[in-house]
């Protein structure tokens, strides 16, 4: 068996085209969706992510504002800037690129973003709405994973779904979305005993640990759908995921690649959330 590849790049392109149509409809009403991306410091990976997000916005016709500040910006100064963006009617979404410098409290900064502009879906109000099945914004990466599963026609109702990684950004919201779709959920973390015994039960396996090649083919149920959220640099300098692709694709039924899988979908769903924010503001 050789797993079919879930092409996140192609799916994200279709979603971006749909976003562009929605942007045109809003623009015709005098509303141009606007996203502000705030970057503090000079982390190279963050700069790449921000550049990709801004480029995607512009290509889809959204108004994008990139605000970059030095690493010695004070937390008070950042909060003041976020407050100004909250009050700016031309900005419908605000994204603060993580990680922040150590002298800043990331939770405090995220909570300062108006919930209706929190297009990352990290604000505690949006996390609570997601928990109760009434999400205002779904976090972009888990949202993208759900779209990938939908595109593959994966039957989630009654399926065994195992998530490796319990972060607030991916693991926990991923569990909520899969649970709401009718799947039976297991979340694994660094304390999980016999990880392979858990992952081999999964009809759907989502891996988000930041550890290259952590999951190999021996840990996968034959025919399972595997979504690799990880993005790492291997010893050879190339991008790789948390799943060992060579062995996994001989066992899985379908698998997302790295790169070209979840990454493009995360950006696509950020655009979707921003357009939804603009549509609500225009209603």
From Swiss-Prot:
Domain of life: Bacteria
InterPro entries: Aminoacid_DH-like_N_sf, NAD(P)-bd_dom_sf, THF_DH/CycHdrlase, THF_DH/CycHdrlase_cat_dom, THF_DH/CycHdrlase_CS, THF_DH/CycHdrlase_NAD-bd_dom
Pathway connected to this protein: One-carbon metabolism; tetrahydrofolate interconversion
Family listed: Belongs to the tetrahydrofolate dehydrogenase/cyclohydrolase family.
Keywords: Amino-acid biosynthesis, Histidine biosynthesis, Hydrolase, Methionine biosynthesis, Multifunctional enzyme, NADP, One-carbon metabolism, Oxidoreductase, Purine biosynthesis
Matches recorded under NCBIfam families: PRK10792.1, PRK14186.1, PRK14189.1
Gene Ontology CC annotation, any one: cytosol
GO molecular function (one): methylenetetrahydrofolate dehydrogenase (NADP+) activity
Full protein name: Bifunctional protein FolD 1
PROSITE patterns cross-referenced by the UniProt entry: THF_DHG_CYH_1, THF_DHG_CYH_2
Organism: Bordetella pertussis (strain Tohama I / ATCC BAA-589 / NCTC 13251)
Name of the gene encoding the protein in the UniProt record: folD1
GO annotation terms (biological process): L-histidine biosynthetic process; methionine biosynthetic process; purine nucleotide biosynthetic process; tetrahydrofolate interconversion
Catalysed reaction, written as an equation: (6R)-5,10-methylene-5,6,7,8-tetrahydrofolate + NADP(+) = (6R)-5,10-methenyltetrahydrofolate + NADPH; (6R)-5,10-methenyltetrahydrofolate + H2O = (6R)-10-formyltetrahydrofolate + H(+)
Residues that coordinate or bind NADP(+): 165-167, 190, 231
Cited Pfam families: THF_DHG_CYH, THF_DHG_CYH_C
Known EC number: 1.5.1.5, 3.5.4.9
Assembly information from the UniProt record: Homodimer.
């Amino acid at each position: 068996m050789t797993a079919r590849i879930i092409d996140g790049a192609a799916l994200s392109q279709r979603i971006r085209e749909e976003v562009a149509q929605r942007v045109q409809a809003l623009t015709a009403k005098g509303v141009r969706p606007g996203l502000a991306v705030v970057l503090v410091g000079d982390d190279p990976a963050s700069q790449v992510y921000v550049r990709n997000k801004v480029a995607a916005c512009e290509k889809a016709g959204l108004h994008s504002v990139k605000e970059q500040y030095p690493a010695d910006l004070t937390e008070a100064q950042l909060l003041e800037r976020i407050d100004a963006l909250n009050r700016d009617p031309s900005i419908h979404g605000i994204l603060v690129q993580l990680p922040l410098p150590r002298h800043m409290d990331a939770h405090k900064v995220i909570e300062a973003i108006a919930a209706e502009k929190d297009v990352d879906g990290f604000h505690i109000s949006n996390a609570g709405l997601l928990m109760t099945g009434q999400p205002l914004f779904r976090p972009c990466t888990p949202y993208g994973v759900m779209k990938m599963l939908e595109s593959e026609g994966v039957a989630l109702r009654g399926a065994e779904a195992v998530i490796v990684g319990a972060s607030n950004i991916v693991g926990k919201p991923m569990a909520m979305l899969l649970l709401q779709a009718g799947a039976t959920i297991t979340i694994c973390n660094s304390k999980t005993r016999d990880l392979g015994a858990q992952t081999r039960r999964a009809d759907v396996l989502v891996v988000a640990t930041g550890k290259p090649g952590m999951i190999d083919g021996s840990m996968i149920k034959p025919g399972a759908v595997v979504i690799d959220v990880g993005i790492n640099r291997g010893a050879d300098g190339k991008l790789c995921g948390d799943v060992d692709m060579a062995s996994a694709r001989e066992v899985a039924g379908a698998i997302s690649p790295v790169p070209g899988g979840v990454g493009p979908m995360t950006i696509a769903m950020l655009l979707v959330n921003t357009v939804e924010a603009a549509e609500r503001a225009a209603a």
